[in-house]
């Protein structure tokens, strides 16, 4: 896909993988709207030249507010990157409210945004949906069962979505990062891929029109 002169929406775009993807796209000539929920990080993104929208996508109200804020804006690329982890051990007290937020942000929000923006994307000569899943969608970790389940669910949704949109102007890409150096993985002692390198590989896959971006070590899965 030609990335220059396109407009991309990047959720979770004020930090980590999302911000790094936004920077790569900007360098390729794409106008980028970053979405996040931290006002300070959004202000920093604005200082880099990005348009910023504040929305908490871990609840239905935040998804609705974002779609309303976008209105009839022209969007060529939607990158569903926002995500969160969830501590979950059935042998210990479980915070079900936090579990629900994780499921909504990681799985429900991408589906809602895709449904809300689908007609606008179909109207574009070329468009793209990028769903950021994880290597854990293929090889789950017993310590993060809810997170792994949401990413596996998004992977399955992405595969079906690609089949349903065959023959339209919309290309569907799944990005599967390994453990990446972000705030979310600060306590993870595994070897981490720099967010900038992850973003470089994802954007290269977008430009090449690939169906999957198996980033870093996920190529081995």
Where are these regions (language model features)?
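Conserved glycine-rich cofactor-binding loop
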Residues: 7, 14-15
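Rossmann-fold cofactor-recognition segment
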Residues: 47-61
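Conserved mid-core segment of classical short-chain dehydrogenase/reductases
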Residues: 64, 68, 85-100, 143
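Active-site helix of classical SDR
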Residues: 114, 150
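Residue(s) in the substrate-gating loop at a strand-loop-helix junction
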Residues: 134
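Active-site loop immediately N-terminal to the catalytic Tyr-X3-Lys motif
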Residues: 141-145, 188
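C-terminal helical subdomain
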Residues: 167, 174, 182, 186-221
């Amino acid at each position: 896909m030609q990335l220059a002169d396109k407009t991309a929406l990047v959720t979770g775009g004020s930090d980590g993988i999302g911000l790094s993807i936004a920077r790569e796209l900007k360098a390729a000539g794409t106008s980028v709207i970053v979405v996040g929920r931290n006002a300070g990080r959004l202000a920093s993104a604005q200082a880099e030249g990005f348009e910023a929208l504040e929305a908490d996508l871990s609840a239905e109200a935040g998804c609705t507010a974002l779609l309303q804020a976008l209105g009839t804006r022209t969007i060529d690329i939607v990158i569903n990157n926002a995500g969160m982890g969830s501590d979950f051990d059935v042998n210990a007290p479980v915070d079900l409210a936090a579990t629900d937020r994780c499921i909504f942000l990681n799985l429900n929000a991408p589906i809602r945004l895709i449904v809300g923006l689908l007609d606008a994307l179909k109207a574009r000569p070329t468009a793209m949906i990028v769903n950021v899943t994880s290597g854990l969608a293929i090889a789950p970790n017993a310590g993060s069962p809810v997170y792994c389940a949401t990413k596996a669910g998004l992977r399955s949704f992405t595969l079906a979505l690609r089949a349903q949109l065959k023959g339209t102007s919309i290309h569907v890409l799944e990005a599967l990062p390994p453990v990446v150096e972000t705030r979310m993985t600060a306590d993870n002692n595994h070897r981490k891929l720099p967010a900038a390198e992850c973003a470089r590989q994802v954007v290269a896959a977008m430009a090449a029109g690939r169906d999957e971006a198996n980033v870093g070590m996920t190529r081995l899965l």
